[in-house]
A protein has these predicted regions:
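Helix-boundary and loop/linker segments of multi-pass membrane transporters
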Residues: 1-5, 24-25, 85-86, 121, ...
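Hydrophobic transmembrane alpha-helices
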Residues: 1-39
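Hydrophobic alpha-helical transmembrane segments
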Residues: 5-10, 45-49, 69-73, 94-98, ...
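Central hydrophobic cores of alpha-helical transmembrane segments
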Residues: 11, 47-57, 93-102, 167-169
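Alpha-helical transmembrane segments of multi-pass membrane proteins
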Residues: 11, 31-35, 71-79, 145-148
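Structural signal for the C-terminal ends of transmembrane alpha-helices
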Residues: 17, 37-43, 80-87, 154-162
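Interfacial aromatic-anchored transmembrane helix boundaries in multi-pass membrane proteins
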Residues: 17-28, 52-84
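Membrane-embedded alpha-helical hairpins and interfacial helices in multi-pass inner-membrane proteins
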Residues: 89-168
Length: 169
């Protein structure tokens, strides 16, 4: 098995395990892996497959509900940010990580509000929902920053150490 396939399998397993192991709310590598797979994969379909596979694998244990579709959509936005930031350097990666975090926050909190189960279907209800999501966003952003640095930084270190990694995975 070539390095690229092993890399993507490792990403799927890392993300699935991180979602299953105890962790602070929203502190997972999901968005960072979506960003990295979108950025690094030669084909967009590979980034999408890696990200959705990681979610689906962990959801076999965690369960899948109506709101899960919004988490999947937010993860695909991270893949899109990865594709957009390709070949644009570190600043673009940082912007992609921030954009991924914000998109996850807005998509998932909007879904909670739109479900009508916890908040009234008014602008005040939407504002209350977003306000209640801020503590979760702090963990989301911290996790995205940590894992983006670890994954992109770790890959850069590996790339320097091993010549065959200079090709896109």
């Amino acid at each position: 098995m070539d390095f690229g396939k092993r890399l993507w399998i490792a990403m799927v397993v890392l993300c699935a395990c991180a979602r299953l192991l105890p962790h602070p709310w929203n502190f997972t590598p999901l968005m960072a892996i979506g960003l990295f797979s979108g950025y690094q994969a030669a084909k967009a379909s590979t980034g999408i497959l890696v990200t959705l596979s990681a979610l689906a694998l962990s959801d076999l244990v965690l369960g899948f509900d109506r709101g899960s579709w919004f988490v999947y959509a937010a993860a695909l936005v991270a893949v899109l940010f990865g594709r957009i930031t390709r070949n644009h350097g570190v600043g673009a990666i940082v912007a992609g990580a921030l954009g991924s975090s914000l998109s996850f926050f807005f998509i998932t909190n909007f879904m909670v509000w739109a479900s009508g189960r916890l908040y009234p279907s008014t602008l005040a209800g939407l504002a209350a929902c977003f306000a209640a999501g801020v503590p979760f966003y702090q963990n989301q952003f911290a996790g995205d920053a940590f894992y983006t640095l670890a994954i992109f930084g770790g890959y850069a270190l590996l790339k320097r150490s091993f010549r065959p990694l200079h090709q896109a995975a």
